[in-house]
Amino acid sequence: MTFSGFDLPDELSALRDLVGRFVREQLRPTEDALGPEAIAIPPEALAGLRQRARSLGLWCLDAPAEYGGAGLTAFELVVVLEEACKHRFCFPHAGAGSFGQSPPVVLYQGGADIIERFVRPTIDLGWTSFTAIAEESGGSDPARAIRTTAKRDGDHYVLSGRKMWITNAERADYGVVYARTDAGISAFIVETSRPGLSTSRIPVIRNHAPTELVLDDVRIPAANLVGQEGQGLALAANWLVRGRLTYAARAIGIAAEAVRLAVQWMGTRSTFGAPLATRQGLQWSIADAAVEINAGRWLTWQAAWKADTGQDARLEAAMAKLYCTELGFRVVDDVMQILGAMGMAREIPLEGWFRDLRVARVVEGTSEMLRSQIARQVLGPAAKARN
């Protein structure tokens, strides 16, 4: 048996290069023109970027091709996301939204009606969405923490409760809300135009603020239930695997770009008569970053490959998200130190990445929760408490 090696397929390499050129030639110049105080790309500029991205086939990257998306597998997506995140406003969405927002992956379990009412408009019309799991009572343990309720009332459900730390809710067209029913946790599609739904921003350290979502007896059609009652946590597990993989890939892309900035700086700056690139302490920082980035990349690729082959990738996705977000934050911190005062300046994206990656270590599974999850998987029954 001949080992075929680790080279990416030519088509995937070409796609990665295409995304990289779009970021360098289209996206970064748009961001640079906004000035250091900007926190997002204005809607009119974003519309132009979206049109150009769509003409290149870079639209709703992981949405199935049969519905009009790019149809990327999990592996293809994480490879591409590395390049798609090498710019200033790469959170909460790679490309600052230039590539559209794919429908929540759970919707594909909802049947033909949900496909027509929500999936196709998301891709065709550029609708945006949110996913609401976390609540004030907790986010890492949804089976116990979710207190939002959904009561059946004839052909409708009535949802009541509060969700916290929700991305996109203030400007989305709809969202997937997880609520407690008689059969357990269930997933519902809630349009933001429904009476009784309101949002408010929660200021945090990064530029993009999450929101609090209040559901005050919000009535939705029973047809907006995704799957069956009680299937919500199973549906959320698939969403979390994909979400954790994308966080890992984005952290790797940012870390790699931060190292590129450091290498460029070290090659042109001198202290006490010698280039920074000759300083052993700084050399070791770059060496450690290069090793960690490569390790994180392979960890993420393995997890994505496992997900694509239909295997349970929850453990590997947790490992990838934990390792890559931690290393991404550490690498950006080190590069800021290498650049000194310039590392803090808003003229370059390091300080924004620093804040974004600090948040990334908390959302979609805190680093501590992921370590506990990994430990339980590795230790097996020995990890369970005994009386």
Per-range role (PLM):
Residues 1-87, 91, 97, 109-114, ...:
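Alpha-helical interface subdomain recognition
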Residues 72-73, 141-144, 168-172:
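Short glycine/proline-enriched turns and hinge-like loops at secondary-structure junctions
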Residues 125-134:
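A short, Trp-centered hydrophobic/proline-enriched beta-strand micro-motif
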Residues 138-142, 157:
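Hydrophobic, small-residue-rich alpha-helical packing segments that form membrane-like cores
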Residues 139, 164-170, 359-366:
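Glycine-rich phosphate/pyrophosphate-binding beta-alpha loops
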Residues 145, 193-221:
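Flexible, small-/acidic-enriched active-site or ligand-binding loops
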Residues 147, 155-156, 160-198:
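A short core secondary-structure module
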Residues 211-238:
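A short, charged helix-loop
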